Amino acid sequence: MVKLADLVREQTFHYAEVAHGQIELNAAVAAYEPERDRLTSHSVTQVPYYLHLTLAQCLGMDSSRIRVVKPFVGGGFGHRVEPLNFEMVTAALARAAGGMVRTELSREECFLTHRGRPETDIRLKLGLKK
């Protein structure tokens, strides 16, 4: 209905790639019990269900043998809405060691771990009526 507008404004906006910069760094603790073939993963994930499925797939374990615990997270702002590689590595190391492994990423590693929001161009056309 832009044809009926009294004022039309069209503009293109460019947004650079954005990396999430939440205060809380990425961290995970995984504990493997070899005698029971069970894994418990504590992670800052925002998607424990997806992490659970991905751990089972990556480790080749039955999902019933994996437990994911998601503590209170101070804020991920979209950074943790998918399983991240450090969570898989922590779990794999715990299983290989037959015990417990803790991983905490540095700020630089947090930026490298997640792809962030991609560079975007938005073309917008607005029609305003008096």
Sequence positions of predicted segments:
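Structural alpha/beta core scaffold segments of enzyme domains
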Residues: 1-130
